[in-house]
Amino acid sequence: DGTAYFISAARDNADLHVYRLSEDYLNVEKLVHRLWQGEYREAPSVIKSEEKYYMITSFCTGWAPNQGKYAVADSMEGDWGMLKKIGDETTYQSQAAFLLNLNGQLLYIGDRWNAENYFESGYVAYPLKVENGELVMEYCEETDLGKYL
């Protein structure tokens, strides 16, 4: 419907806040959610697929990768429910940067941080799919980005 939202960490990263933006996207109109209070989630990335919204987040561990988790909602202002694990215990050594829906195919783009030489940090790309309402991240050594175009 063209409504834009801004998601940020709040209370020293203890919570995630979801704000609805004004029609021109220049101002916050309303705080619509305080998500997972006290859970210390960061790096929120949202994608819509099959009329559902999926948000992937990570735990606040600085440069160290950790278990990514996701939640599902019927709308950005709806109930996000419980966090569920995605990927392996380190989200395949990454942290969500953004999610893409390219021609109906879902793609996770993650930061792969290098704590000792941050300027050598890079990105990874992993296919995502929805199976029976659950978001699944497919590990692969290489992702052919050409098939998404």
Cite the ranges covered by each PLM segment.
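Carbohydrate-active catalytic/glycan-binding domains of CAZyme proteins
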Residues: D1-L149
